[in-house]
Amino acid sequence: MSEYTRQLPVVALRNMAVMPGMLIHFDVNRKVSIEAIEAAMLLNQQVLLVSQIDAETENPTADDLYRVGTIAEIKQMIKLPGNVIRVLVTGLERATLDSLVSEQPYLKAQLTSKEAELLNLTEAEEEAMVRALRDLFEVYTTENNKLNKDIIRQVEASREIEKMVEQLSIHIPMTLEDKQLLLAASDLMEQYERLCLILADEIEVMRIKRELQNKVKDKVDKNQKDYIMREQLKVIKEELGETSSVSDIMQYLEQLKELVASDEVKEKIKKEIERFQNVAGSNSESAVARGYVETLLSLPWDKVSEDFMDLAYAKEVLETEHYGLKKVKERVLDFLAVRQLTEKGDSPIICLVGPPGTGKTSIARSIAKALNKEYVRISLGGVRDEAEIRGHRRTYVGALPGRIITGLKQAKVKNPLMLLDEIDKMSSDYKGDTASAMLEVLDSEQNCNFVDHYVEIPVDLSEVMFIATANTTQTIPKPLLDRMEIIEVSSYTENEKFHIAKNHLLNKQIEKNGLKKSQISISEKALRKIISDYTREAGVRGLERKISEVCRKIARELLEQESKENQNLIKSAKNKSNNKNQSHSEVAAAVEAEEISVTTKPSKIKVTEKNITTYLGKPKFRNEIASQKDEVGIVCGLAWTSVGGTTLQIEVNSLPGKGALILTGQMGDVMKESAQLGISYIRSLSKEYKISEEYFQKNDIHIHIPEGATPKDGPSAGITMATAMLSAITGKKVHAKVAMTGEITLRGRVLPIGGLKEKLLAAKNTGIKKVLIPEKNRPDLEELEQEITEGMEVICVATMDEVLKHALV
């Protein structure tokens, strides 16, 4: 190896090395490197290129540089914007950096150039080395088809081992460390051996890469680039013995250990976790398996909350938060008493039936609070798909558990209070009958093994306290109705509405509208006037809206009053000020700074019976009597709807014809049959009321119920229609202040009806003084509060003779 010493400017390179014979350009932006380039251009255009050991070092010293670099000749230098120089260099020979002579204004090194010592090889030995290197290169080019063909031709054309080593050192991609090892090699043989090792390693890497790509191509379509990248990553992790879901699986196993469940359930979940582990990590099957495992782990299999068994506390909570609802409260307290005596018993399945706004949903929340149960509300209104209850089978895309299982997940315990809201509003379609799906849920004998289609493992619902709500039982299928304990939540009386408004609604709306009790006062008479003149409902929702409207208007009135007082205060302060040119804001600031004592206390607005119209306008309802005088053929009936009771005027006219019975007013089939019964019964009384047989052949009977756009049905108008028809035929008048309800038989017996409380309230609101009800409804009458019948005479009748006796003038 021939060596000689000299000094040259030094350029420190980052993350790159220049080999002898290499033509390359690079950018220089460090000041010392730019100075070195410019100094070299002034001398012989030669510079020593040395790689930095750490690329992050900004001002390298001798210890920060590799000991071996390359002497290069600068072919071209271009100045770029931003104080950057681009240089084109050619590597000439290797050199050893002995020391740095100076570091400012640029690095200058004392170096020793060295040329690789030529080997004393025979022609055959050199040919063997060339062929071996060429064979390795051919294998490399086979694996790497991106190599430039000109480079391949240059290497293959080389006949000397020295030339071939130089060409391969330049063109084969290798790490900075490998390039430094080649530069530091003591002779050509060492360079040759290192190059062979580098080529062999590159070939192995390329082969593994090709195998990975082939595995990926067998699984996915070639055009899905993003998907291919994910699969490549997955295959690499598989080759390394790693999987992407290891952490998730470990987490699932930890959750399984802590899960409170039976051994059978745990074993099933463990199998599902193992199945998830065996599924590929990025396909749809994996997502389904993951969702299923997470659902199973989140269910409260045997986790329960401790119920409060304090009867006094439960009673206090129920009485404090709700007025009335006596039957509901008694049933809850009965359940608590039984639970205390037996320690364990079936949870009740209750259905609260009543008009809207009567507190069915809110009482359920209070019951949960009284019993210390988790509260879950499931809205069933409009649900028509069976899968909403039982869940979807996991074979379907986007499958989910049903609402019952979802409710348990939300509660996180197996003994919550679950409110099934609007159970009478469920419907069915071609996908299944939701009411039938609810049969298993609400059957205390079966729901201990409820099977959701998604979960597929029996879930115990026997400890869930189900409370359903409905406006009517008529739309609930009989088998489902039979499984529930029906508790009627009847309409509120005016007195009950008053207490609810005074003790609950008023305080709630004052707080909701940002007011204070010291700012508003609504008298008792004003509340009663709102109830009687501005609402007509079974519940209290409309009443709450009216109270809210009053509070909103008072809030605005208070703010306007305060603003007006502030304006007067500022105006007064400005008049007292000597500076008449002060702006409005300056005066306001001065008033605030000096705390002028003209501030007024917020006034209290009182709402009374006299000024209630200021806030709510004219009354919307009046207690009017249906008929002001006794008339022929007009009778006041009583009806019961899903939103409460109402009066029903039935009008009958007799006119010449052919004996037809004309029915108008959108009557249902049951009501039409009641009309037929009534006319048949009246014909049986022909002799008693001196009606000729020819009358029914020569006259038509027309029965009409006003508000013809509203459908009407039910049997309880039987005695009303019969009385109206007899009045029209005989010309006898009916008492205007008498209302009646009851079903009639062909023999004239009066059968019982439902919704007695609602009907009596409707009669009272209309100003009726006497009400005729079936004798068999006497027990229902005795259960009613005295205030409902106060001011009315309620007469129980067993036959039509008694009805006619009290109704006809």
Swiss-Prot record:
Residue ranges annotated for the Lon proteolytic domain, each copy included: 629-809
One GO CC annotation: cytoplasm
Subcellular location: Cytoplasm
GO BP term, pick one: protein quality control for misfolded or incompletely synthesized proteins
GO MF: ATP binding; ATP hydrolysis activity; ATP-dependent peptidase activity; sequence-specific DNA binding; serine-type endopeptidase activity
Gene3D superfamilies with a match to the protein in the record: 1.10.8.60, 1.20.5.5270, 1.20.58.1480, 3.30.230.10, LON domain-like (2.30.130.40), P-loop containing nucleotide triphosphate hydrolases (3.40.50.300)
Location of the Lon N-terminal domain: 8-203
InterPro entries with a match to the protein in the record: AAA+_ATPase, ATPase_AAA_core, Lon_bac, Lon_bac/euk-typ, Lon_lid, Lon_proteolytic, Lon_Prtase, Lon_prtase_N
Family: Belongs to the peptidase S16 family.
Function: ATP-dependent serine protease that mediates the selective degradation of mutant and abnormal proteins as well as certain short-lived regulatory proteins. Required for cellular homeostasis and for survival from DNA damage and developmental changes induced by stress. Degrades polypeptides processively to yield small peptide fragments that are 5 to 10 amino acids long. Binds to DNA in a double-stranded, site-specific manner.
Name of the molecule in the record: Lon protease
Gene name of this polypeptide: lon
